[in-house]
Amino acid sequence: MILTALLAVGCGVLVGFTLGLIGGGGSILATPLLLYVVGMQNPHLAIGTGAVAVSANAFMNLSGHARAGNVRWPTAAIFTAAGVGGAYAGSTLGKAFDGQHLLILFALLMILFGVLMLRPRREGSHAPAVLTPRYVLRTAGTGLGVGMLSGFFGIGGGFLIVPGLIFATGMPMIYAIGTSLFAVGMFGLTTAANYAMSGLVDWIVAAEYIAGGVLGGLLGMRAAIYLSGRKQTLTRVFAGIIFIVAAYMLWRSLGHG
């Protein structure tokens, strides 16, 4: 029990650290770490537990970005309102999906995420958003699609939400990161509630994960300040880690190890 608790806290620190250092992508490590380091045997239990931790850590990180003025609340509301319904539908489908097949798809999504991380990102407009019908429809449509993927895989989806917001609205990266945290928290909360209703959340491990995430997030944000000039290098290193973890998940899920 003590070893499991230490592993859960340690993994929470790692996820929180990567969230604080490079943004929303760190949440994608939550489920693999619960499965292969903490030692959870049930993929669905790992997804539900990870969703609780990701949601809590996202809301805690949101407060700092909100104080800095990095959250565009009207856009966050439109994106999240559409995405919550998608997250519920996606998580309902995910619970009914075979656990091992779900992990294979999860690993493939991780590879896609790694590729997206390596792509250069354009800087958007700093002007306040004008809520035209086209803007609202595009934002809501993107939110619905990202919410479904987030719920299906039990992840906060920050790595999908950030490029999704930039694609839909053209906002700068810093605003996309801040705005995404509200959606990450709400999508994760929706997924966690759906899994919890089926008894697929280990609340003790979730609490340990959250505690580690708080510490890791603080360390990650401090590291990001000191290493801001090397952020592209750090992103590439993290993408490499994602590829390695995805390859390991595929290897395990296909009957090896």
Give the ranges of each region predicted by the language model:
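Juxtamembrane transmembrane-helix boundary motif
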Residues: 1-18, 31-43, 63-149, 167, ...
